[in-house]
Amino acid sequence: MSENNQSNQNNQINKIIKSTIEEIEKKFGNESIMLLGQKEKCDVDVFSSGSYAINSALGIGGFPKGRIIEIFGPESSGKTTIALHTIAEIQKKNGFAAFIDVEHSIDPVYAKNLGIDIDNLLISQPDSGEQALEIVDILAKSGSIDLIVVDSVAALVPEAELNGEMKDQSIGLQARLMSKALRKITGSLSKNKTSVIFINQVREKIGVVFGNPETTPGGRALKFYASIRLDVRKSTNIMLNNDISGNQIRVKVVKNKLAPPFKIAETEIIFSKGINKFGEVADLALVHDVLQKKGAWFSYNGNNIAQGRQKLIAQLESNNELFEEIFQKIVEKENQKLS
């Protein structure tokens, strides 16, 4: 085939593709189909998780808009605290959030302590799994909600199980419910840039000798549809004056469709206060060489500023000017890493 014939054939194919795209856009809307390389679709909008360490581990600076996120781990590991901090960050940007309290366990006082405007937080305490996920679907389709948190997947009990007797077998009902709901809401979330955080627990599979015996409720659909999956574990207790004042937690990004996965973030959750942002800044400043450590002393711009980590955190907490200066340098380093 000559070069002219090949060129004419390519032009003809391009015309057909262009005509087909126009037909699809006319029928389903301007954003229904496009080239993957179109810049506006490649740039991922994000919002902060409320933790500098987690934002860094995610590789894109936060959670992605219009996506499904799963935060799972054992009880009292900090899953709900991370989700509540994320709601507070959404509200700081004048966004709207909803909390689907399936467990009926939200603490308004704690939420307020984390910076949430509880007067502007939508909350629902549904009676069944179907009702909870139907509410998520309606909120997603409204286009007015930036973030929906579902706490938790394990508590999404299907109506058939609620209405049945204790002796009735209900194997697979929850998995089928989740699969159907996620198929239904994924398109609305992407179109309206609404994100959903599903908080999940861990269970142990019976009879597993080799490999990881842990699994999460809700079947495989959530693992498949989630763009981000975070595994949250408590590592150690934080002691202050011989009393436990909080927990050190370890967050592993086990799935990430937008950046390299398997990165780990370590942070502290202080009881009644939430994530210790001053401790995170102290740790990240060392990682990015904004602060230097020699022995027990921490130095900044060649000058010793604190002896010991706790005194450094206290210094950052009391000196807002120093905190902002160090934090901005960390942000610059993080932005260089993202670009």
UniProtKB/Swiss-Prot annotation:
SMART domains: AAA (SM00382). GO terms for biological process: DNA recombination; DNA repair; SOS response. It holds the Pfam family RecA. One of its GO terms (cellular component) is cytosol. Disulfide bonds: none annotated. It comes from the Bacteria. Transmembrane segments: none annotated. CDD domains: RecA. One of its GO terms (molecular function) is ATP hydrolysis activity. InterPro entries: AAA+_ATPase, DNA_recomb/repair_RecA, DNA_recomb/repair_RecA_CS, P-loop_NTPase, RecA-like_C, RecA-like_N, RecA_ATP-bd, RecA_C_sf. Keywords: ATP-binding, Cytoplasm, DNA damage, DNA recombination, DNA repair, DNA-binding, Nucleotide-binding, SOS response. Its main location: cytoplasm. Can catalyze the hydrolysis of ATP in the presence of single-stranded DNA, the ATP-dependent uptake of single-stranded DNA by duplex DNA, and the ATP-dependent hybridization of homologous single-stranded DNAs. It interacts with LexA causing its activation and leading to its autocatalytic cleavage. Belongs to the RecA family. NCBIfam families: tigrfam_recA (TIGR02012). PANTHER family: MITOCHONDRIAL DNA REPAIR PROTEIN RECA HOMOLOG-RELATED, RECA. This is Protein RecA. It comes from Mycoplasmopsis pulmonis (strain UAB CTIP). The lineage of its organism: Bacteria, Bacillati, Mycoplasmatota, Mycoplasmoidales, Metamycoplasmataceae.
